[in-house]
Amino acid sequence: MASTQPKNDAKSTEPKPEQPVTEKKTAVLEEDDEFEDFPVDDWEAEDTEAAKGNNEAKHLWEESWDDDDTSDDFSAQLKEELKKVEAAKKR
């Protein structure tokens, strides 16, 4: 059973000391700042993809970066919903 008396929370009645706002400034990079380069990987010829490919050109990535596949169910459902919305607007 819940108590009808409000709780006396000591934390809520004490005034909070005001904390000074300190603004941290980030270091600004200048044009002449030097950056550490990555080490050069020295690959052995037999460790490369060309050595394993039997002189066959292997596609390591897709020729087309177009991810728009309009034949999936979601695209078809979306097109139907758009048609319904357009029809409702014309009324």
UniProtKB/Swiss-Prot annotation:
The keyword Magnesium does not apply. The keyword Transcription does not apply. It holds the Pfam family DSS1_SEM1. InterPro entries: DSS1_SEM1 (IPR007834). Keywords: Proteasome. Residues 29-48, 63-72 have a biased composition (Acidic residues). Residues 8-28 have a biased composition (Basic and acidic residues). GO terms for biological process: double-strand break repair via homologous recombination; mRNA export from nucleus; proteasome assembly. It comes from the Eukaryota. SMART domains: DSS1_SEM1 (SM01385). GO terms for cellular component: proteasome complex; proteasome regulatory particle, lid subcomplex. Residues 1-73 are annotated as: Disordered. Part of the 26S proteasome. Belongs to the DSS1/SEM1 family. PANTHER family: 26 PROTEASOME COMPLEX SUBUNIT DSS1, 26S PROTEASOME COMPLEX SUBUNIT SEM1. Subunit of the 26S proteasome which plays a role in ubiquitin-dependent proteolysis. This is Putative 26S proteasome complex subunit sem-1. It comes from Neurospora crassa (strain ATCC 24698 / 74-OR23-1A / CBS 708.71 / DSM 1257 / FGSC 987).
